Amino acid sequence: MKLVYAIVNSDDTYAVNKGLLKAGIRATKLSSTGGFFFVRKTTLLICCPDEQVDLVIEVCKKYSKKRKQFVPSSTIMEPDGAASYPVEVAIGGATIFVTDIERFEKV
C-alpha cells in the first residue's frame, strides 16, 4: 500500500477529485497554503495499492493545469520596493509525494 500526497492549486481541486472518482479512487481533501506567493492549495491524501500509483499520478497530471498569472511585482520585490508593475509567473500543476504505508486500519 502507498500513501500519495498530491498538492494541487485550489482552482484544480474539483477537476482532479472528479477524475480520481471516475477512476474509482477516493481522496481525503485538506486545505493548505504554500509556494512563493502563499497561494491557496489543496492537499489530497490518497491511499492506494502499489499498482494504482501510476494511475493516480496520471489523473493528477491530466487535471492539474499549469498556467501563467500576473501578480504585482511588489509581491516578489523587497517590501519597501517602489515598483508595483505586474509580473507574469507560472502557477498550477501538482506536487506529488508517494510514501509506503506500514500499517492501515479502518475502524
Predicted segment positions?
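Positively charged, small/polar-rich N-terminal and surface patches that mediate targeting and assembly
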Residues: 1-107
